[in-house]
Curated annotation (Swiss-Prot):
InterPro entries: Integrase-like_N, TACO1_YebC-like_2nd/3rd_dom, TACO1_YebC_N, Transcrip_reg_TACO1-like, Transcrip_reg_TACO1-like_dom3, YebC-like
Protein name in UniProt: Probable transcriptional regulatory protein Tpet_0454
Signal peptide annotation: none
Keywords annotated in UniProt: Cytoplasm, DNA-binding, Transcription, Transcription regulation
Primary residence: cytoplasm
GO molecular function: DNA binding
């Protein structure tokens, strides 16, 4: 069985491979602008900015684009005033959806989201309706074929402060507190591992969906991700691996 994490990884790979690459850049630039505005333009003293810049570099964003976005955030260059807004709701089948948006027009974003929720048979809910279902965690991912000694990896991660290790799927996931993410990541990189790290929201419980509901959920989540104002979408669905792959293949076809 797989859930939101597998969907997010598949979606990200497809976006990186096709014409939607520019949409990734748009979202990353907004994140850099807001991170620099809130915590300053120095990546050494601003963890959120450092994480955003690392993501941008991983996507091969040109250096000048990154620097320009930082200057827009610090006010050295004129830029759009983005606000961070959280939206919560339910997808088909009762799946909880937690959305983080960066927008210059909250009314427009709320209207577009309400339209999508209604279109796909979900419902936009009040603040606090589903946030309690999710925990904010640091997640480090390492491709299974890059790990020669799983026991060694686990020891390094645990000694550095990791909370949990999920080694049943690919990539292997190491769970940390948001505060310990940077330390665990650094220790793994010092040991020679190539990792991807992020702060995310992990559901405490999941909702299994199948058939039409499963298709509607994935179609709905894809539509949310395609919105320029939406930075991240989190959900607590769970479905069969094969069914997810078949549905995504049809949707992307």
């Amino acid at each position: 069985m797989s859930g939101h994490n597998k969907w997010a990884n598949i979606k990200h790979r497809k976006m990186a491979q096709d014409a939607k690459k520019s949409k990734i850049f748009t979202k990353l630039i907004r994140e850099i602008i807001v991170a620099a505005r809130e915590g300053g333009g120095n990546i050494e003293t601003n963890p959120r900015l450092r994480a955003a810049v690392e993501k941008a570099r991983a996507e091969n964003m040109p250096k000048e684009n990154i620097e320009r976005a930082i200057k827009r955030g610090t006010g050295e260059l004129e830029g759009v005033d983005y606000q961070e807004v959280i939206y919560e709701g339910y997808a088909p089948g009762g799946v909880a959806v937690y959305i983080r948006a960066l927008t210059d027009n909250k009314n427009r974003t709320a209207q577009e989201l309400r339209h999508l929720f209604n279109k796909y048979g979900g419902s936009l809910a009040e603040s606090g309706s589903v946030s309690w279902i999710f925990e904010r965690k640091g997640v480090i991912e390492i491709p299974r074929d890059k790990v020669k000694d799983l026991e060694e990896l686990m020891m390094i991660a645990i000694d550095a402060g990791a909370e949990d290790i999920k080694d049943t799927e690919d990539p292997i996931q190491i769970i940390t507190t948001p505060e310990n993410l940077s330390e665990v990541k650094s220790k793994l990189e010092e040991a020679g591992y190539e990792v991807e790290a992020k702060v995310t929201f992990i559901p405490k419980n999941t909702m299994k969906v199948t058939g039409k509901d499963a298709e509607k959920v994935l179609e709905f989540l894809n539509a949310l991700e395609d919105m320029d104002d939406v930075q991240e979408v989190y959900s607590n669905f769970e479905m069969d691996d094969k069914e997810m792959e078949e549905i995504l293949s049809r949707l992307e076809g």
